[in-house]
Amino acid sequence: MNEPQGRIENGVVRVGGDARQRYYDSRGYGRPLDGNEIALAPVEAAHLLYRGDLRIEDMDFPSFVQGVEDPSFFVRYLVYADLRERGFYLSPAREGWVPDPPAEAQFVVYERGSGPWDDDRLYDLRVAGERESLSLTTLHGALAVVDEESEVTYFEVDRPEIEGSSAGFSKPTEADLLADRAIVWNPPHELFSAAFYGQPLSGREDGDGPIQLSLLEAAYLADRGVLSTDGSILERGREVEGDRFERRLAVYAAFRERGVVPKTGFKFGADFRVYADVESIDDLGHSEYLVRVLPPDCARSPREIALDVRLAHGVRKRMVFALASANDGTEPTWISVGRLTP
């Protein structure tokens, strides 16, 4: 056998001979040491062992994998091997392998045709098993989830800019509270037809008749001094939903302040669907996002994330998680997640 032999030392596999040319320069494995020697991270060494491109004394692929104490190692290996098979070069996100290793990521994936020698990054990659719990605020770049059958599903994660050009509404208006909604008996024409607040009592075609407002819509208008009612909308909202109402109200207000119209997402299984550029009720445009409102410290399982992303994708939208506190005045954190095909 002509394959170089490595030795395990301080948690890495060191390989000499022509290792730099053979592994790093030509295929993006490892990191250079002195001369032609390189260090391989365990996941890189495992992949080369499996392919028969490396020898380690008295060890084969099964014994090497079983000897790694990190319980998440094999999940990371499956993702590493999958991306290698797809033609990508990637490096472990650790000191010595990449400059400024990204927090919460396990790999740095490079653009096709690029590798660790030029640091042309495609994305930072977080790896998780399907039974893990993930803090949404720690997600960025891309996420790879390995399910119980060892299949890998990829998601892209970003922080969207929420902005639109929809019309506002400022005419003083009166409403009556009725259980968990409000009714504007004599609404200004612009309330529904231009600003897209509420629903006409007798159907969408009758924009000048009585308008039903959700408690969120009514609370937002009341807070801005536009709507007056015969009772406290906030108190009613808290009675109906507790802290969840105030979190949803914070997100609703943030959308409206950015020129975006949020409407109920109930029929899609979400909190909101949103419209960025409403010119009139007859020209709504496409609803780009489905929005789920969650507490700032919320953790989700990969299964829950996958369900939400699949739900949004099925109706040609993208899922946004809005992380908001209940009535503390802080801005929501927006996290968008979608399917990714490497």
Each PLM stretch: what is its role?
Residues 1-342:
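Long Lys/Arg-rich low-complexity intrinsically disordered regions in nucleic-acid-associated proteins
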